[in-house]
Amino acid sequence: AMKLSHKYLDIGADVIYGGNWSYKWIRALRDEYVPINSHVGLVPGNATWIGGFVAQGKTADKAIRILEHTLELQEAGAIGVELEVVPPKVAEVITKKVDIMTLSMGSGSGCDGQYLFANDVLGYTKGKIPRHARIYKDFKKEFEKLQSERVNAFKEFHSDTVNKKFNDPKITV
């Protein structure tokens, strides 16, 4: 993880996203000046263990646990945390109680910023669109048309190659 993190930073990454890494890993990366953004609430990789793709922190006990987890991530050295599908009031309270950046994904406007995937924003998510996603423009048909045109262009190229149509003086020396 350390080697790859430095590689990504060297090629332009601003931060490494560590969804559900251990505090030990986050501390080790912090000690090597690798900025880490972490993830609490609905962490998709943990869906099997948390009851599926459902909101987290809806009871007082679970909300407190998300706050404690966020504070532990802060102590370990994370520079920020994504709060995914957490009740807006819980996300707002957490944002006020931590010193690191908070990003909301389906957790209301009380965080420091918002986080959505480009394919959701642009409307070309395949399958079920998450409830917390917001589509701003529906590019699905345009992307499908563009993909069809790409395929057709390569078919034409293949045909010209098979039929030896590269003797045009405009493209040969």
Regions picked out by a protein language model, each given a short descriptive name:
Residues 1-173:
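Alpha/beta enzyme core
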